[in-house]
Amino acid sequence: MLNVVILAAGLGKRMQSDLPKVLHTLAGRPMLDHVIGSARQLQPARIIVVVGHGADRVKAAFEGLPGLQFALQQPQHGTGHAVQQAVPQLLEGDGEDDVTLVLYGDVPLVQPATLQNLLQARGRGVAVLTEVLADSTGYGRIVRDAQGQVCRIVEHKDASEAERAIKEVNTGILAAPTARLKDWLGRITNDNAQGEYYLTDVIGLAVGDGVPVGAAQPGASWETLGVNSRVQQAQLERAWQSELARRQLEAGVTLADPARFDVRGTLSCGRDVFIDVGCVFEGTVTLGDGVRVGPHCVLRDVAVQAGARIEAYSHLQQAKVGQEAVVGPYARLRPGADLGERSHVGNFVEIKNSVLQADSKANHLAYIGDADIGARVNVGAGTITCNYDGVNKHRTVIEDDAFIGSDTQLVAPVRVGKGATLGAGTTLTKDAPAGQLTISRARQSTIEGWKRPVKKS
């Protein structure tokens, strides 16, 4: 039976923020959410988050998730003291297979595969996740015996000069038999330079009890990087985005510049996708085969089908784009926009909660809201569907092959029949019959002999 304890009680003073440190984001998600996500992939019996500073805000952000519980550390007296607060909630089954994995809410990118390796390295004993660093300043050192076995971990402030020369460091992440961990946590002391209860002291206790201590290393160095400042947060953000870019490149996506590419959710791409510079992908985004995304676009929870083009500076949110459709430049698709195949939505066109069927076009300067637009419809520049009466929204229906002249207002609820034409400048307040020209502008007249006024002296 696997328990996961995530330490998330820290103040995060160096972040210079009122927001609890573990709620600061990485790739659009709270750091703690990344850790919980990795832990869930191990299918633990229980996840216990130890909270302290900003406990109510942290709990509010995650409360209600199945299998997730909270323990309060108040005040904070070190990592060992933090895990002690979770002890009453640890589950135990048949004994030997009961294990507790300790993770950190501010070390957000440790991957499930690395954690699986750590659990395997444990055998029937304890395992720690270690890293070899060129500069190990500030880290706890891994001390090994003459046989190369881990015998203890010494914190930097308590280390001798010889120990400080060690390059293998403790990441803080460990796995231990649950029953023994409970015993060791009851035996650790705060007799150290910091006056705190160190979780790392359980390693020395394990060795003293004859329990083997194994070690595993992460698949990549960025997996064990922690965040204690805005600088470190920014550095880790770039490291993670670089990794996400690498994965897309290896999957066959062309990125104009991998250093100017941001994913803040999940991005799934087909074959031969091209993504230009400065694009941001949020939520769940799917790009079909041959899709091209121009520079500086933002796509949030969007599905784009094969062969479509999203031109520069377009913003799409909760929208669908059909095959070979063209969006932009400078277009905005709001929630509920659904574009059919080969449809065109051009510059400064906004579409919300509307369907635009195959081969229809709104190429310039239009607002289409709460509308059902058929196939092969042309929407002229300056067209507005007037969908809101101040209280309720109303729908506009434009049937197949209709032609909407420029500078037209359609006051919903209203219907334009199949093949109908609306003359430029029309304000439509009643249904327009199929196949007919409907026009409502005033008749043009010329006033002969009219003179412009002149400025009085």
From Swiss-Prot:
Enzyme kind, highest EC tier? transferase
Location of the region described as Linker in the Swiss-Prot/TrEMBL record = 231-251
Spell out the catalytic residues: 364
Q: Name one GO molecular function term.
A: UDP-N-acetylglucosamine diphosphorylase activity
Q: Which Pfam families match?
A: Hexapep, NTP_transf_3
Keyword Cell wall biogenesis/degradation among record annotations: yes
Alphabetic keyword roster: Acyltransferase, Cell shape, Cell wall biogenesis/degradation, Cytoplasm, Magnesium, Metal-binding, Multifunctional enzyme, Nucleotidyltransferase, Peptidoglycan synthesis, Repeat, Transferase
According to its UniProt record, where is this protein mainly located? cytoplasm
Magnesium as a keyword of this entry, yes or no, is: yes
Which InterPro entries does the UniProt entry name for this protein? Bifunctional_GlmU, GlmU-like, GlmU_C_LbH, Hexapep, Hexapep_transf_CS, MobA-like_NTP_Trfase, Nucleotide-diphossugar_trans, Trimer_LpxA-like_sf
Documented EC number(s): 2.7.7.23, 2.3.1.157
The record's subcellular location field reads: Cytoplasm
Q: Where is this region: N-acetyltransferase?
A: 252-457
Its annotated pathway reads: Nucleotide-sugar biosynthesis; UDP-N-acetyl-alpha-D-glucosamine biosynthesis; N-acetyl-alpha-D-glucosamine 1-phosphate from alpha-D-glucosamine 6-phosphate (route II): step 2/2; Nucleotide-sugar biosynthesis; UDP-N-acetyl-alpha-D-glucosamine biosynthesis; UDP-N-acetyl-alpha-D-glucosamine from N-acetyl-alpha-D-glucosamine 1-phosphate: step 1/1; Bacterial outer membrane biogenesis; LPS lipid A biosynthesis
- Quote the record's binding site residues for Mg(2+): 106, 228
- Ranges annotated as spanning the membrane: none
Top-level division of the source organism's lineage: Bacteria
Entry-linked PROSITE patterns: HEXAPEP_TRANSFERASES
Any one cellular-component term (Gene Ontology) = cytoplasm
Where are the stretches annotated Pyrophosphorylase? 1-230
What does this chain do? Catalyzes the last two sequential reactions in the de novo biosynthetic pathway for UDP-N-acetylglucosamine (UDP-GlcNAc). The C-terminal domain catalyzes the transfer of acetyl group from acetyl coenzyme A to glucosamine-1-phosphate (GlcN-1-P) to produce N-acetylglucosamine-1-phosphate (GlcNAc-1-P), which is converted into UDP-GlcNAc by the transfer of uridine 5-monophosphate (from uridine 5-triphosphate), a reaction catalyzed by the N-terminal domain.
Q: Which HAMAP family match?
A: GlmU
Q: Its family?
A: In the N-terminal section; belongs to the N-acetylglucosamine-1-phosphate uridyltransferase family.
Please identify the protein, giving its name as recorded.
Bifunctional protein GlmU
- According to its UniProt entry, this protein's organism is Bordetella parapertussis (strain 12822 / ATCC BAA-587 / NCTC 13253)
